[in-house]
Amino acid sequence: MAQAESLFEHNRRQWAGKEAPLAERMRPPSFDEFVGQQHIVGSERVLRKALEADRLPSFILWGPPGSGKTTLARLVAQPANASFSPVSAVTSGVADLRRIVGEAQENQAMHQQKTILFVDEIHRFNKSQQDVILPHVYDGTVIFIGATTEYPAFEVISPLLSRCRVFTLEALSPEHVGDIVRRALVDHVTGLGKLHADLAPGALEQLVIVANGDARVALNALETAVFAVEPDDCGQRKIDLGIVSDALQRRSPMYAKAGEGHYDTISAFIKSVRGSSPDGALYWLCLLYTSDAADERSSVDLGGRRI
């Protein structure tokens, strides 16, 4: 079982190196290259200590999109000497969960190997689907890792939540997003290094601001921008502010006035203004203006002045 999984992972990585989106290819292979979330992944933190002691608990990763939830789950599985079974709550159901549980029981009986069940977007599973997981977390058949952008107390059933530690991930800082983008530009193996892209300082700032802490948004926009530019006579691809702004605006933004997206959009607008990024400010202002929030004639506070 472990050998087959290793072969699958090898083939997946080969494909990822050639065809997968940049954000997928740039997932860090180790904790040493993981950017941000040091309050969780730091060498002296609880999660790392549990890994070192081979006492990994079931836990839930709660945080905004692009903050590293899926990457962290994969990294945790590497040193845990366990079979890693990932599913998405969007595309999987009870039959998939029961199949994984059956394989976990077989691994446990025949190979004395643990199984990590990783459920991405656990909030998309209803109560009945979450109930299927519950007894197998209780008896230790699986170590459960869930990832969600929603408040766990509202979306995860209480019995399952009571058996899990909740780790809260933060949106990546502008410095962290900038580091990830720069790494992608120079990485010749999984990044864009072979394309010799040169990102103008203003373009990098715009990319970081509009990404608003989401590394996936930044990397996807970067990849779009780089491939939108033809190399010059020297083989260089010059990426200016206009190209980056265009790449960012091709993204369909998620905006929900009733949820956190409303406040995230206002936050991104304020950061763009304070960061002296007119293109970014106009982008987020237009998004606010064309939303239902405009009907409320809302105003935002910018350093003591309301607009």
Predicted regions and their residues:
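Conserved C-terminal helix/linker of AAA+ ATPases
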Residues: 229-250
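Walker A/P-loop
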Residues: 8-10, 51-52, 56-86
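Short conserved motifs of the RecA-like P-loop NTPase core
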Residues: 194-210, 265
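Conserved AAA+ ATPase "SRH/arginine-finger" region at the nucleotide-binding site
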Residues: 166-177
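Pre-Walker A (pre-P-loop) alpha-helix and adjacent loop at the N terminus of AAA/AAA+ ATPase modules
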Residues: 17-58
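Short glycine-rich substrate-engagement loop in P-loop NTPases that contacts/grips substrate
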Residues: 87-113
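Conserved small/polar residues in nucleotide/adenosyl-binding loops
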Residues: 289-296
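C-terminal helical "lid" of AAA+/P-loop NTPase domains
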Residues: 205-209, 216-230
